[in-house]
């Protein structure tokens, strides 16, 4: 949720953000109008209630016919107060509905446009060339080494499901363990998070549970399967006041994740690039508004550290405004080179959500004066970033393959695989 005071005082800034996203600018003026209506309704209610209180004192002092007349007026006034209160509640609800409809304000420097209008921040490493043999794709390799079974995944659960078995299961567990150890070394608190959350938690994180076709819902329980542990980690401190005096609070959550991929018909139907269920280690940070941009750079650096450990060529892109989720004010993606596709594919992303999620979830920090006396509270900033996920297996198998289909294990991963240096063909 955005700051309505900031929007009212700087509407052009929010209009520009909406334009950059390719979104409707008129919602800005609608929010300003709704806020004015809310304020007016609240003033009417408070004035009538003050008048009602004053009448109450008069009634207490009056006698006889005068008291009866005043009681009649009080009855009429009470009805007016009740109506004004209802009007104020309606105005408040209308404003909140509009506030929940507008995405986060983008930060300075985010490129305008849609999915293809990103900016390449940097490219690290060179895509591997295969002069001596034609590279196999990750699914063919996965079948040769007994790591991936799509056929039985479809038999058991349907399309876009799979089994990781043998070295495939071990490789994923190794990735997740290496990611979690790196996060712990960087000061993150490890978390195993729920994968089912309440609608208010999902909405508070910035997802539209009514219209988002990517979300699985358990209707009988009114619970939602998360597509990232970011959701549970964001809701962890809902309705709390945090102490950030010692620095940011950092969590690393590991969970299974679920996505319906409803808008992906016909895309990436082969292999495990786009699936309904996968595992992930997600970094999540609570910090001050002033420190958010620096934390975003740190998250990106930690993601790049993981990519370097896996010895993968990659690039970092600054995602265009129109391709940002509702909650993100800025997002960097790390994309690894996938040889058989001749393209970079996203492995990680990191988003600065500024105070958007915290306002929706009512997460604040205590603010002190220079003398240390309490000054009040304000919304914190939240950020997230992926450290490892099932999709990494795609890039690792393809980039490190040998002609026979075996795969060289990146040196940093070998200790998590019992010293295994090569994933052999069966």
UniProtKB/Swiss-Prot annotation:
Its EC number is 6.1.1.11. Coiled coil: none annotated. CDD domains: SerRS_core (cd00770). It is found in: Cytoplasm. The keyword Protein biosynthesis applies. ATP binds at residues 259-261, 275, 346-349. L-serine binds at residues 228-230, 282, 386. One of its GO terms (cellular component) is cytoplasm. It catalyses: tRNA(Ser) + L-serine + ATP = L-seryl-tRNA(Ser) + AMP + diphosphate + H(+); tRNA(Sec) + L-serine + ATP = L-seryl-tRNA(Sec) + AMP + diphosphate + H(+). Its main location: cytoplasm. Signal peptide: none annotated. Keywords: Aminoacyl-tRNA synthetase, ATP-binding, Cytoplasm, Ligase, Nucleotide-binding, Protein biosynthesis. GO terms for biological process: selenocysteine biosynthetic process; seryl-tRNA aminoacylation. GO terms for molecular function: ATP binding; serine-tRNA ligase activity. Homodimer. The tRNA molecule binds across the dimer. Catalyzes the attachment of serine to tRNA(Ser). Is also able to aminoacylate tRNA(Sec) with serine, to form the misacylated tRNA L-seryl-tRNA(Sec), which will be further converted into selenocysteinyl-tRNA(Sec). Consists of two distinct domains, a catalytic core and a N-terminal extension that is involved in tRNA binding. Belongs to the class-II aminoacyl-tRNA synthetase family. Type-1 seryl-tRNA synthetase subfamily. This is Serine--tRNA ligase. It comes from Arthrobacter sp. (strain FB24). The lineage of its organism: Bacteria, Bacillati, Actinomycetota, Actinomycetes, Micrococcales.
